[in-house]
A protein has these predicted regions:
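Divalent-metal coordination cores built from histidine and acidic residues
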Residues: 1-29
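Short, surface-exposed amphipathic charged segments that create phosphate/polyanion-binding patches used
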Residues: 1-3, 102-104, 160-163
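Short gly/ser/thr-rich secondary-structure transition/capping motifs
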Residues: 5, 67-70, 192-195
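Structured loop/turn residues at beta-strand edges in well-structured enzyme cores
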Residues: 6, 20, 82, 141, ...
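Active-site core of metal-dependent hydrolases
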Residues: 27-157
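His/Asp/Glu-enriched, well-ordered alpha-helical/loop segment
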Residues: 131-213
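Short, Lys/Arg- and Gly-enriched loop/turn segments at beta-strand edges
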Residues: 217-222
Length: 222
């Protein structure tokens, strides 16, 4: 994460050659990965780099930040982000979550949401805390995006994210409205990727990528 080692020229070439696929820059800010005392500075550097690349290339690169077990508060990280940037793993409970034990949301997190920062649940293997999720949802803080954050080596591995239907079932069990969940796994991600009206919709003329499920009320047994 040493900015002195960033190969910006190579970044430009790769982004230019893959404009249709590269939507942003991602940085992982976890304890043991970045120094405790300067964690937020690394994020500010990446945000500045995204601005510079956008100015030179005419792109609209977002910044996505991995926030699980961050060395600095969730509010400090959220305060660095621009409208449209992504606060990833918003319900992690490993360290410095967005919600305190008394159920209050970090004020800087709320301000970030007001100015358009995107909050992605991105469950993954170790990036979801049930207590943090319950507290945040009870406070009315819903995720903009619900995703799995799956990698090849974690797909179908219980009891974590496993697959998207399992993640959807988690949020149903947590009490979220079904339509709200579906919007967070289809319509909103499509819009953020610049594909609104093409995917994540049943609109006539859209790309047909459809899964049909039966909703069944039953105890989940691993």
């Amino acid at each position: 994460f040493n900015p002195a080692l960033y190969n910006v020229e190579k970044m430009e070439r790769v982004i230019e050659a893959n404009r249709d696929n590269i939507l942003g820059l991602k940085i992982r800010l976890s304890k043991g990965v970045v120094p405790d005392e300067t964690g937020a500075d690394y994020l500010r550097t990446v945000v500045k780099l995204a601005d510079e690349l956008n100015a030179r290339l005419g792109t609209s690169l977002r910044v996505c930040v991995h926030t699980t077990n961050s060395p600095v508060t969730a509010g400090e990280l959220a305060d660095c982000l621009r409208p449209g940037d992504i606060f990833c793993h918003c319900f992690q409970g490993a360290g410095n979550p967005i919600v305190a034990e008394d159920g209050t949301i970090d004020p800087l997190v709320l301000k970030a949401r007001e100015r358009g920062v995107i909050f992605d649940a991105a469950n993954g293997k170790g990036n979801f805390g049930l207590k943090a999720a319950k507290r945040a949802l009870a406070a009315g803080f819903l995720p903009d995006v619900i995703s799995t954050d799956l990698t090849v080596d974690k797909f179908n591995m219980p009891p974590y994210a496993k697959n998207l239907p399992l993640v959807i079932s988690k949020y149903l069990a947590l009490g979220l409205d079904f339509n709200t969940i579906i919007r967070a796994v289809t319509e909103t991600p499509a819009r953020l990727m610049g594909l609104e009206g093409q995917i994540g919709t049943l609109k006539a003329g859209a790309i047909a990528d459809i899964a049909i499920f039966d909703l069944k009320d039953r105890e989940y047994v691993q």
